[in-house]
A protein has these predicted regions:
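Conserved small/polar residues in nucleotide/adenosyl-binding loops
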Residues: 214-215
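Short cytoplasmic-facing helical segments at TM-TM junctions of multi-pass membrane proteins
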Residues: 110-135
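Hydrophobic alpha-helical segments embedded in or immediately adjacent to the lipid bilayer
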Residues: 134-178, 197
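Selective transmembrane-helix segments that form parts of the transport pathway or gating/packing helices
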Residues: 42, 46, 50, 89, ...
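Active-site cofactor/substrate anionic-group-binding motifs, chiefly glycine-
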Residues: 41-93, 97
Length: 215
């Protein structure tokens, strides 16, 4: 029976994700491989995350600040920027960046290994390819996605504060007070939601990228 390619990819992703998560719960994790993948998905993609965070914070802040300043409520700029970034922009843009920088590298690595029959060789050596190749990469994405998301949020707020002060004469103390305790301010639930979203995005992205091992 013929099955569409997208259906095969979906089934492959579900299978590989389930197997990898099973190995994680059993504690079958190579620390050396995990550390190597953390270096690739962390410091290896840090620069692009920081640059995009600065750009996003600048653009978002200029749009928000211009409207709020014209209405005479420039003291709320920081809070609106923080909430908008934490709830939607930071996890979404971070996931997009991690997809382009890290997930594509994972897919290319496993695709090359499959074409050159390295995965079959690993299996013949009685090493489980899911445990050896997938688990470290999956965990690295799950661990580094929220960390990168927090860095993205921090940089975007810092960038927004600088431009608010330069263009709209908003004192830094007013900006950061708005972030912490304004009418619209950043709360622990916003941060928790952002972390959960980034973890889920990291899990989904890595499973899809690593499903090539079964295709």
């Amino acid at each position: 029976m013929y099955y569409p390619k997208f259906f095969k990819r979906l089934v492959s992703s579900l299978i590989i994700g389930g197997q990898a998560i099973n190995y994680v719960f059993k504690g079958k994790i190579s620390r050396n491989d995990l550390f190597e993948q953390l270096m690739e998905s962390g410091p290896g993609s840090l620069l692009i995350v920081l640059i995009t965070g600065i750009a996003a914070g600048t653009v978002f802040n200029i749009q928000v600040a211009s409207q709020l300043t014209s209405m005479g409520v420039s003291s709320e700029i920081g809070g609106l920027l923080a909430v908008g970034m934490a709830r939607e922009m930071a996890p979404l843009l971070t996931a997009t960046l991690m997809t382009g920088k890290v997930a594509t590298a994972y897919a290319a690595q496993l695709g090359t290994m499959k074409v050159t029959e390295q995965i079959e060789a690993i299996t013949m050596l009685r090493t489980e390819p899911i445990q050896y190749l997938v688990v470290p990469r999956l965990l690295s994405m799950i661990i580094m996605s929220p960390i990168q998301c927090l860095l993205f949020l921090s940089v975007s707020l810092w960038s927004g504060q600088i431009w608010s002060t330069i263009f709209y004469n908003v004192p830094p103390i007013v900006f950061w007070t708005s972030v912490r305790s304004g009418n619209v301010s950043l709360t622990s639930s916003d941060l928790s939601s952002m972390i959960i979203k980034s973890v889920v995005f990291g899990l989904i992205i890595s499973i899809i990228a690593l499903s090539l091992i079964h295709i």
